Design a protein with these regions (language model features):
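Hydrophobic alpha-helical positions that pack around
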Residues: 109, 286
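Bacterial N-terminal signal peptides that target proteins for export
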Residues: 1-13
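Aromatic- and charge-enriched surface segment that lines or borders ligand/interaction sites
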Residues: 116-133, 293-310
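Local sequence-structure signature of Cys/Sec-based thiol-disulfide redox active-site neighborhoods
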Residues: 60-69, 240-246
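Flexible coil segments in periplasmic/lumen-exposed cytochrome c-class electron-transfer proteins
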Residues: 32-51, 76-104, 134-234, 240, ...
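C-terminal motif of bacterial Sec signal peptides marking the signal peptidase cleavage site
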Residues: 19-22
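Bacterial signal peptide processing site
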Residues: 24-26
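Short, cysteine/histidine-rich loop/knuckle motifs that typically chelate Zn2+
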Residues: 73, 250
Length: 407
């Protein structure tokens, strides 16, 4: 899958520029055998600094999901970061996403009636998230089937443009998606900003979505290269849910050349690249293969990569207690993960969630040998103002952002 973007969406660099938000430990909960229920329980903001007094619980949960799933990475402007730019869509042609010849222009998802999603009901937004159906071309009805022409599913469906990750969200609980819809409709201020329509070949949807869905395993264990016995490990099961829901397979699944052992094995072909400005990124092999994957790294090194964006191959196996280079075991000259790795969005996740992800990658997958060519970027890429701008789409705690409503 070739995705080209002429700016850096994810601030996966310059960690010292911002402060990571400390997250309260999650409440204990029984592990449900339904993957989606596990992930939903771990995503709740609880009573930590992300919550706001007097706000409905569904909006708090919806905000947490919108933040940790990096919705702002596509749906917020970076080159023209206005105070009201959060979730208001792209502002320049440079922010287009190109996948296999299809030009996607992320939409304004604030509740503006004219240019955003204000004219759609929460049910229509839910249907968009659950089934990938464009809300403007789908009636406000309950859909009970995903087969065209049945159960109110449109006979000729019009789908949302990629990289909208709705195929991964088919494994999420309905309540999660209702919570996101509630947050977008009720907690975000409307911003009037019209985004041009996406453009692409007429047969794009059938070919692309068939491959995309193939990169996302079903909730039941195992896929071809998962460890069957790991389904009994509560921590691994929670981590698996998070990996699926956060669309890790979109980049690390090797979509251009899917095979029986292709889950999370990284880029397989030369076209499995992400072009972001001057950077060419190839998603790495995340299986625990000792030679070509994560096998030689500890769970703590993987955690440090997820929490701080530090390359595990250039970071020792130590506890890090500071975000300041040279302090608290943070490397004096840090080497960061290449975008579009969304770890900045994960600063709103708990440490336990990220440890769960690390456990799944180390203990829940079979090693698959697949050597990925190194990413390419100019020497001054990380330190440029080009990367500093990318911090804008991720609001910090406490809330609100400039264009969120205050209860």
């Amino acid at each position: 899958m070739r995705l080209s973007r002429s700016h850096c969406r994810h601030p996966t660099f310059l960690a010292a520029v911002f402060v990571v938000v400390a997250c309260a430990p999650p409440n204990e909960m029984a592990v449900d055998d339904r993957v989606e229920a596990v992930a939903r329980g771990r995503a709740d903001p609880r009573d930590d600094e992300r919550s706001r007094a007097g706000e409905e619980p569904e909006i708090q949960r919806g905000r947490a999901l919108v933040l940790t799933h990096a919705c702002a990475a596509c749906h917020s402007a970076v080159f023209d970061p206005a105070a009201d730019g959060y979730l208001a869509g792209i502002r320049t042609v440079a922010e287009e996403i190109t996948i296999e010849g299809f030009k996607t222009r992320p939409r304004n998802i604030t509740p503006d009636n004219e240019t955003g999603i204000g004219r759609f009901s929460e049910r229509q937004i839910f249907n968009a998230l659950r089934f990938g159906l464009r809300p403007g071309e789908t009636p406000d009805v309950e859909i009970t089937s995903n087969i065209p022409g049945k159960g109110n599913f449109p006979a000729r469906p019009k789908y949302l443009a990629p990289p909208m990750p709705w195929p991964t969200w088919r494994h999420m609980a309905d309540q999660d998606l209702w919570d996101i819809a509630a947050y977008l409709k009720r907690a975000v201020k409307p911003v009037k900003h019209r985004v041009a329509d996406s453009e692409g070949p007429p047969d794009f949807w059938a070919s692309h979505w068939t491959k995309r869905i193939g990169s996302h395993p079903a909730p039941s264990f195992p896929t071809a290269n998962e460890v069957a016995g790991a389904s009994g490990d509560d921590q691994v099961q929670r981590g698996r849910a998070l990996v699926i829901h956060h669309a890790c397979g979109d980049c690390h699944g090797g979509v251009d050349n899917p095979s029986a052992d292709g889950w999370l094995v990284g880029a397989r072909t030369e076209t499995d690249t992400f072009q972001i400005g001057p950077l060419v990124t190839r998603a790495r092999n995340l299986t625990p293969d000792l030679e070509t994957g994560l096998g030689k790294f500890t769970e703590r090194q993987i955690f440090n990569a997820l929490r701080y964006g530090l390359s595990p191959s250039a970071t020792p196996d130590v506890e890090i207690t500071s975000m300041t280079p040279g302090s608290g075991n943070f490397p004096a000259q840090p080497r960061y993960l290449a975008p579009p790795m969304p770890w900045p969005a994960w600063r709103h996740m708990t440490d336990q969630q990220l440890r769960d992800v690390a456990a799944y990658l180390k203990r829940g997958l079979k090693p698959v040998k697949n050597k990925v060519i190194d990413s390419q970027h100019p020497p001054d890429f990380w330190a440029s103002t080009y990367t500093i701008q990318a911090i804008g789409p991720y609001p910090a705690s406490p809330f609100p952002t400039a264009n969120e409503k205050v209860p």
